[in-house]
Amino acid sequence: MDEREALIKAGEIARQVKKEVVDLIKPGAKLYDIAEFVERRIVELGGKPAFPCNLSINEIAAHYTPYKGDGTVLKEGDYLKLDIGVHVDGYIADTAVTFRVGMEEDELMEAAREALENAIATVRAGVMIRDVARAIEETIRGKGFNPIVNLSGHKVERYKLHAGVSVPNVYREADTYVLQEGDVFAIEPFATTGAGQVIEVPPALIFMYLRDRPVRMLQARRLLMHIKKNYKTLPFAYRWLQDFLPEGQLKLALAQLEKAGAIYAYPILREVRGGMVAQFEHTVIVEKEGAYITT
């Protein structure tokens, strides 16, 4: 399977899981059950999770994934952002959709969805990133909402979810990267009723391996080896490690590894004013005359 075939296969799996999960999104549903279903189906369909299933509600914009024992349930009217990642041999599909639990799509969701459509319509080889960002910003502001300025889409490479080039939600003169044929990008507009900025809040429930570092605690060394072997350079969930070590030891080991610079912790991201947040996302392959949507 070549790179393009793997990217397309990952996208097909992500699309299928998005379809299947709809039936679970209802008042009273547990986030834990939804995340476990999503990740299990990814594997059953022939892929692997490229990152933990993100389930972020209302003013939480990103990086919430449930843990074992998490009792969080969906309530009618919640804005649920479902962000899923699939990889096939390291080639990634990253896609997100917002649900209004028990209700129809509203104007906030429409703004984010249309921003994604308009952004993708600008994508082709030779276009600057800032022109894609402009389409996102103009669409969201035109609908009376704010784009989130400190969240962005990103270039994707094999086993690298964030490959060094961002696709912001707002136009910036300095974003002069020119899209190349064959580039893979995840484009993800975030629209909010709030101020248009996110802040980090504890706890971190998602982590990523950075590098080997000496640590004193034996369990921390064992944990780092386990992380490297199983997740390579892709993000992983606290939940995925809860059976590996007892709770107290796991928290201590993760804290040591983070302090040593061996792993990176992704804090939960919340809209600064508590505004509602909607997000839609596709992964695209840049082509001469447009974009091939894999998801």
UniProtKB/Swiss-Prot annotation:
Keywords (A to Z) from UniProt? Aminopeptidase, Hydrolase, Metal-binding, Protease
**Comment on bound cofactor:** Binds 2 divalent metal cations per subunit. Has a high-affinity and a low affinity metal-binding site. The true nature of the physiological cofactor is under debate. The enzyme is active with cobalt, zinc, manganese or divalent iron ions. Most likely, methionine aminopeptidases function as mononuclear Fe(2+)-metalloproteases under physiological conditions, and the catalytically relevant metal-binding site has been assigned to the histidine-containing high-affinity site.
Which reaction is catalysed here? Release of N-terminal amino acids, preferentially methionine, from peptides and arylamides
Q: Which SUPFAM superfamilies match?
A: Creatinase/aminopeptidase (SSF55920), Winged helix' DNA-binding domain (SSF46785)
Query: What biological-process terms (Gene Ontology) are attached?
Result: proteolysis
Binding-site residues, substrate: H63, H162
Residues that, per the record, bind a divalent metal cation 1: D83, D94, E281
State the GO CC annotations. Answer: cytoplasm
Cofactor (UniProt) = Co(2+); Zn(2+); Mn(2+); Fe(2+)
Q: At which positions is a divalent metal cation 2 bound?
A: D94, H154, E188, E281
Coiled coil stretches, renumbered: none
Provide a Gene Ontology MF annotation, just one.
metal ion binding
Query: Which Enzyme Commission number(s) are listed?
Result: 3.4.11.18
Q: Subunit arrangement?
A: Monomer.
Family, per the entry? Belongs to the peptidase M24A family. Methionine aminopeptidase archaeal type 2 subfamily.
In UniProt terms, what function does this protein have? Removes the N-terminal methionine from nascent proteins. The N-terminal methionine is often cleaved when the second residue in the primary sequence is small and uncharged (Met-Ala-, Cys, Gly, Pro, Ser, Thr, or Val).
HAMAP family, from UniProt? MetAP_2_arc
Full protein name:
Methionine aminopeptidase
Organism listed in the record: Thermococcus kodakarensis (strain ATCC BAA-918 / JCM 12380 / KOD1) (Pyrococcus kodakaraensis (strain KOD1))
**The organism's lineage?**
Archaea, Methanobacteriati, Methanobacteriota, Thermococci, Thermococcales
Its gene is map
